[in-house]
């Protein structure tokens, strides 16, 4: 049988090959995670490997018998599991229960001791579906293009969660038979893929999923029943329901904006009287894809940038900078706006048009646009600024539509809650400087960590809270933004690189 030799770090192994499958397809089949933000269409450049010493894109090369393939190191870095902790108290049950946050980029698991109500173990990993695309749209497309697409995506994520649960059980010397339930929260697409339910209806209007998990779906993992958080709509999932429940906003008087920003920006505005909600397609820029030197929040990624006469940065893992993750990208863009390197229209200016203190960092591309060099290896292009511009305009426009639906202004918001890993690392002043988020007093802006995991944890500890979760989802009124003139107008206005308060 024909095979290739694969090297990743200190691991060396062989996998079978044939005359038709790309290297990316072979690696997927072998369970080797390799980023493919564009879904394997040769556009993102994130699946670059070495084949017989030559740099190649795994999605574009069909390896031959005997080839040697060197893969980049597996992604390292910290995955957010910190969250709003439910009060630890005896539940009256024995055994254990698990909460799972099924994110598009990461997967986090918490195992709870039901006797004490305390966390017994926690595990996390980068979502194995990244090999099929960085965002839910590319994964939906994969299921439509490939006859076995749905089973492949469902199988790989179920295997990953099962592996994480097994690790958590092993950490506490427990057996699978002690697991009473698994509560899972994710966006609607991720929950459908996990359950093995077709996501094709979400590829076109009216974007109605086969189920919103408001009725029980029969499913088990390691012999324990799986409970899915109910979703608000096709693109506002159980992760938002979980977050609204865990943050207390579902029971709080006032008008609060809840944001979970990633490749799919989900948001809700309201309080105990109900919510209006929507989703915007941010694209993968916030996750580091579609950006020349972009990367996920892994070792080597610049996560924070500051300028006080000189540039300073935080690098995940503490080593040399190799790229920009979403929070670092926004910090850098905000600095360049303030320093006159990016103008209001989003143009990255060439050296001769910027203040003298910035000129040493700039070169020109073949079209005469500026290229900003943060380090020798990390730089920002005009195309990168454009990718960020589209993503941040989508978020700002979604917020404006929700405000208009509620008939209130930014000043009348009682608070803004930022959920998820991106919300933890995002500098709100940077997001405000580029016109992505409103500028609010510090006391009204709250970063609440992995609220999806917190909501799932509440139901893992107390199964009766499922009724509260269902009520929360049913009290969310979904606004479909596609085709709306007010969203299109707000999106156009949001393209400028200036604070929201000036528009």
Regions found by a protein language model. Name each.
Residues 4-5, 74, 78-83, 223-242, ...:
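Acidic, glycine/GT-rich loop-and beta-edge segments that sit at the periphery of enzyme/chaperone cores
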Residues 271-273, 404, 408-473:
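Catalytic phosphate/nucleotide-handling subdomain of diverse soluble enzymes
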Residues 174-208, 433-438:
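Short beta-strand-loop/turn "lid" adjacent to the catalytic site in phosphate-handling enzymes
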Residues 337-406:
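A contiguous, well-structured pocket-lining segment that forms one wall/lid of small-molecule binding clefts
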Residues 33-64:
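Local cysteine-cluster metal-coordination motifs and their immediate loop/turn environment
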């Amino acid at each position: 049988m024909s095979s290739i030799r694969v090297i990743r770090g200190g691991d060396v192994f062989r996998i079978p090959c044939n005359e038709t499958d790309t290297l990316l397809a072979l690696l997927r089949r072998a369970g080797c995670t390799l980023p493919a933000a564009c879904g394997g269409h040769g556009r993102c450049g994130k699946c670059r490997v070495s084949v017989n010493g030559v740099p190649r894109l795994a999605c574009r090369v069909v390896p031959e018998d005997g080839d040697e393939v060197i893969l980049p190191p597996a992604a390292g870095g910290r995955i957010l599991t910190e969250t709003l902790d439910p009060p630890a108290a005896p539940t009256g049950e024995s055994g254990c229960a698990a909460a799972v946050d099924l994110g598009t980029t990461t997967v986090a698991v918490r195992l709870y001791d039901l006797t004490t109500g305390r966390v017994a173990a926690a595990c996390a990993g980068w979502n194995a579906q990244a090999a099929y695309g960085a965002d839910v749209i590319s994964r939906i497309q994969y299921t439509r293009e490939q006859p076995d697409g749905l089973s492949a995506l469902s199988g790989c994520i179920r295997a990953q969660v099962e592996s994480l649960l097994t690790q958590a059980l092993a950490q506490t010397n427990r057996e699978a038979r002690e697991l009473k339930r698994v509560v899972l929260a994710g966006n609607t697409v991720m929950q459908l893929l996990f359950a093995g339910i077709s996501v094709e209806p979400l590829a076109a209007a009216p974007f109605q999923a086969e189920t919103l998990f408001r009725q029980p779906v029969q499913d088990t993992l390691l012999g324990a029943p799986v409970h899915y958080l109910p979703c608000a709509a096709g693109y506002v999932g159980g992760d938002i329901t979980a977050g609204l429940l865990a943050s207390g906003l579902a029971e709080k008087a006032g008008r609060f904006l809840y944001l979970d920003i990633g490749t799919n920006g989900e948001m809700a505005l309201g309080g105990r009287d109900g919510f209006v909600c929507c989703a915007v397609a941010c694209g993968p820029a916030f996750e580091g894809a579609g950006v020349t030197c972009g990367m996920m929040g892994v070792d080597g990624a610049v996560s924070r940038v500051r300028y006080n006469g000189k540039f300073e940065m935080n690098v995940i893992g503490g080593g040399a900078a190799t790229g920009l993750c979403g929070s670092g990208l926004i910090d850098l863009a905000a600095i360049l706006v303030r320093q006159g390197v990016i103008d209001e229209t989003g143009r990255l200016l060439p050296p001769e048009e910027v203040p003298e203190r910035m000129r040493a960092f700039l070169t020109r591309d073949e079209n005469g646009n500026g290229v900003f060099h943060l380090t020798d290896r990390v730089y920002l292009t005009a195309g990168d600024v454009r990718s960020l511009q589209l993503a941040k305009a989508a978020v700002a426009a979604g917020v404006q539509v929700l405000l208009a639906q509620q008939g209130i202004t930014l000043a009348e918001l009682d608070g803004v809650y930022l959920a998820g890993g991106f919300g933890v690392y995002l500098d709100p002043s940077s997001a405000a400087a580029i016109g992505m988020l409103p500028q609010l007093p510090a006391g009204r802006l709250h970063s609440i960590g992995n609220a999806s995991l917190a909501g799932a944890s509440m139901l893992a500890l107390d199964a009766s809270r499922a009724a509260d979760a269902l009520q929360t989802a049913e009290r969310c009124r979904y606004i479909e933004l596609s085709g709306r003139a007010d969203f299109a107008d707000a999106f156009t206005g949001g393209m400028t690189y200036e604070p929201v308060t000036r528009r």
